[in-house]
């Protein structure tokens, strides 16, 4: 028994150090693994944190770039708007340069009067300028007027110098430069010296443009108190016309003639069809009141207004309607004088016998004297005022 106890003690004493050493190494190995695991875990945490930081930076950069892009877009739109405003300002400025006046009719007239007085030193001052509307094919009509109420040669020149009355046939040019039509007018003008040539292409459907051209050109050449347009198939008493206009000298803006308000024609087959009929309201409406186109007169300020504003004055199909439309909205006195539209005999003859001499005579149904080439002489004999009337008119120039 004693021997066994001794053996047990020896074994115990031998294995204790071994167990301690083994435990030590096992502890060291376990601790090393724990440290290794802990180190790996820390590295992963650090890596994850770094990635989070990088993602945050990238996100912030993206947001910054997006905001920057949006800011650029906004700035680009602002620049576009600014450029558009500048372009609009330039357009308005150009339009303002084309207009002589932009605020009111009174200002327009004041500007017109100033321009006229400035240029007056270079223009002949006269009482009235009469433009007789004619065409290439109307030679016989022109001759019928030369043989009746329109003075010729030296008398025509004397009428301008002594009475301040200018009477001219107004005509443009053909669509082909230096055509036979133009040369025929050149030859006729060389013979009579009674044409006023316009920078205008002749044509029946261009009468509104021709009227605008006449007033503009006449204002540029003569400083007149009145400007008159007459058709070449109308009989006129020059002395009565001059005296009538002289009675309105004190009025600054007058529009004189036989005022009417005819229907707006919409049918395509109608001779005087108005393509822009819709501007005048419902079907069946009438035009605003305007002077009939056979003869009318306007004062200096209105003619100058047309000249100054011709680029923006709208033209309708009918010339007389067009002229009336230009004065809508202006402070203009319309004078409806029925002596401007007497009928042919017996109407004008009866008036003459009653002491009421007509300014102009024509037939409404023909928009002029019917068969004027054949009948103008008869009308002149029965309704004319006499050759001395125009020379007796008191037209002292102001």
Curated annotation (Swiss-Prot):
The keyword Manganese applies. Disulfide bonds: none annotated. GO terms for biological process: protein glycosylation. It is a single-pass type II membrane protein. Keywords: Glycoprotein, Glycosyltransferase, Golgi apparatus, Manganese, Membrane, Signal-anchor, Transferase, Transmembrane, Transmembrane helix. Its main location: Golgi. One of its GO terms (molecular function) is galactosyltransferase activity. Its cofactor is Mn(2+). Its EC number is 2.4.1.-. The chain crosses the membrane at residues 11-31. Gene3D superfamilies: 3.90.550.50. It is found in: Golgi apparatus membrane. It holds the Pfam family DUF4094. Glycans are attached at residues 110, 115, 206. Beta-1,3-galactosyltransferase that transfers galactose from UDP-galactose to substrates with a terminal glycosyl residue. Belongs to the glycosyltransferase 31 family. This is Probable beta-1,3-galactosyltransferase 5. It comes from Arabidopsis thaliana. The gene is B3GALT5.
């Amino acid at each position: 028994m004693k021997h066994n106890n001794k053996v047990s003690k020896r074994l115990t004493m031998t294995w204790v150090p071994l167990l301690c050493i083994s435990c030590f190494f096992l502890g060291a190995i376990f601790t090393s693994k724990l440290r290794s695991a802990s180190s790996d875990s820390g590295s992963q945490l650090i890596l994850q944190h770094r990635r989070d930081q990088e993602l945050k930076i990238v996100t912030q950069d993206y947001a910054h770039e997006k905001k920057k892009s949006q800011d650029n877009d906004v700035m680009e739109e602002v620049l576009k708007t600014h450029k558009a405003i500048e372009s609009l300002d330039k357009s308005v400025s150009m339009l303002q340069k084309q207009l002589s006046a932009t605020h009111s009719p009174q200002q327009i007239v004041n500007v017109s009067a100033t321009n006229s007085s400035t240029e007056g030193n270079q223009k002949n001052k006269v009482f009235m300028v009469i433009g007789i509307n004619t065409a290439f094919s109307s030679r016989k009509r022109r001759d019928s007027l030369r043989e009746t109420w329109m003075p010729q040669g030296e008398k025509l020149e004397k009428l301008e110098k002594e009475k301040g009355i200018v009477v001219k046939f107004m005509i443009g040019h053909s669509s082909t430069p230096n055509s036979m039509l133009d040369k025929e007018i050149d030859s006729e003008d060389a013979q009579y010296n009674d044409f006023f040539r316009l920078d205008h292409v002749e044509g029946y459907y261009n009468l509104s443009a021709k009227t605008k051209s006449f007033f503009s050109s006449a204002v540029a050449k003569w400083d007149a108190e009145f400007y008159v347009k007459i058709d070449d198939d109308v009989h006129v008493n020059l002395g009565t016309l001059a005296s009538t206009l002289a009675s309105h000298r004190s009025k600054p803006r007058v529009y004189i003639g036989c005022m009417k308000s005819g229907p707006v024609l919409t049918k395509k087959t109608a001779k005087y069809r108005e393509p822009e009929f819709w501007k005048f309201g419902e079907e069946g409406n009438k035009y605003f009141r305007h002077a009939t186109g056979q003869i009318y007169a306007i004062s200096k300020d209105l003619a100058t207004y047309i000249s100054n504003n011709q680029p923006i004055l709208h033209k309708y199909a009918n010339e007389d309607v067009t002229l009336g439309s230009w004065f809508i909205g202006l402070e203009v006195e319309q004078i409806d004088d029925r002596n401007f539209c007497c009928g042919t005999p017996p109407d004008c003859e009866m008036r003459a016998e009653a002491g009421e001499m007509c300014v102009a005579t024509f037939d409404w149904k023909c928009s002029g004297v019917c068969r004027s080439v054949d009948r103008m002489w008869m009308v002149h004999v029965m309704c004319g005022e006499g050759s001395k009337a125009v020379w007796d008119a008191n037209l002292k120039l102001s």
